[in-house]
């Protein structure tokens, strides 16, 4: 399975994601911000980092690059797309997932391990979990607080993917830290599954996100 890992100026988690995708058994390849055709890929991951230095706001400039038009085409072709941290912010900016990820309630960079509850298993990335399973992954962001004007609609549509369990470190509405589109194929999560994919890192809970992509495609 060929999985694209998108690189923007300022991305810094692309090599980590590429490494974990290889461990999961995928065939990852780097994709640059100016590529206009991704038809040869089976799925895409938009990794974390600080695309374009987070100027204007996190993800705002990356959202208008040529590669994001190609990502929209992949979505129309019903191929899975995962955005992690800055990647989640980018997906929200382009409107592929509901709501926004904005400045933390305390205006500081938040970097810590968190406990999370998996709220839906209908996405390719959470299909190997059980609903309401509690997992452990780290977060690292300054603009990760989730907000939506009509949060009841997000819950009713089963679009909440991850929710903080216990402590809500950034003030996200309802503790939400991961959402998906209505199809479940586009998933945006602020925690870093690639940083929780090997025993030496302290958790392997995140590895299921990447194995799930392969399982989804059979």
UniProtKB/Swiss-Prot annotation:
Residues of the Glutamine amidotransferase type-1 domain: 2-218
Localization per Swiss-Prot or TrEMBL: Cytoplasm
Recorded GO CC terms: cytoplasm
Listed SMART domains: GATase_5
GO molecular function, one term: glutaminase activity
Alphabetized InterPro entries for the sequence: Class_I_gatase-like, PRibForGlyAmidine_synth_PurQ
Main subcellular localisation: cytoplasm
GO biological process: 'de novo' IMP biosynthetic process
Reactions catalysed according to its record: N(2)-formyl-N(1)-(5-phospho-beta-D-ribosyl)glycinamide + L-glutamine + ATP + H2O = 2-formamido-N(1)-(5-O-phospho-beta-D-ribosyl)acetamidine + L-glutamate + ADP + phosphate + H(+); L-glutamine + H2O = L-glutamate + NH4(+)
UniProt keyword list: ATP-binding, Cytoplasm, Glutamine amidotransferase, Hydrolase, Ligase, Nucleotide-binding, Purine biosynthesis
Domain of life, per lineage: Archaea
Protein function: Part of the phosphoribosylformylglycinamidine synthase complex involved in the purines biosynthetic pathway. Catalyzes the ATP-dependent conversion of formylglycinamide ribonucleotide (FGAR) and glutamine to yield formylglycinamidine ribonucleotide (FGAM) and glutamate. The FGAM synthase complex is composed of three subunits. PurQ produces an ammonia molecule by converting glutamine to glutamate. PurL transfers the ammonia molecule to FGAR to form FGAM in an ATP-dependent manner.
NCBIfam families noted in UniProt: FGAM_synth_I, PRK03619.1
Protein name, entry field: Phosphoribosylformylglycinamidine synthase subunit PurQ
Organism: Methanothermobacter thermautotrophicus (strain ATCC 29096 / DSM 1053 / JCM 10044 / NBRC 100330 / Delta H)
Gene name, Swiss-Prot/TrEMBL: purQ
């Amino acid at each position: 399975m060929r999985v694209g890992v998108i690189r923007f100026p300022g991305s810094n988690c692309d090599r980590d994601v590429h490494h974990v995708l290889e461990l999961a058994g995928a065939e990852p390849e780097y994709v640059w911000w100016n590529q206009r055709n991704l038809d040869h890929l089976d799925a895409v991951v938009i990794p974390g980092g600080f695309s374009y230095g987070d100027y204007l706001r996190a993800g705002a400039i990356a959202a208008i690059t040529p590669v994001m038009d190609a990502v929209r085409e992949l979505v129309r072709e019903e191929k899975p797309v995962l955005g992690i941290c800055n990647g989640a912010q980018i997906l929200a900016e382009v409107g592929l997932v509901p709501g926004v990820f904005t400045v933390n309630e305390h205006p500081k960079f938040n970097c810590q391990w968190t406990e999370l509850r998996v709220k839906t298993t209908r996405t390719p990335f959470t299909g190997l979990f059980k609903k309401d399973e509690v997992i452990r992954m780290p977060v690292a962001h300054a603009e990760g607080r989730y907000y939506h004007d009509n949060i009841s609609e997000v819950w009713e549509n089963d679009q909440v993917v991850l929710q903080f369990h216990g402590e809500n470190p950034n003030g996200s509405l309802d503790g939400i830290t991961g959402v998906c589109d209505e199809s479940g194929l586009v998933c945006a999560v602020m925690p870093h599954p690639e940083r929780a994919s090997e025993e030496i890192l302290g958790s392997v809970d995140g590895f299921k996100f990447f194995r799930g992509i392969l399982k989804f495609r059979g």
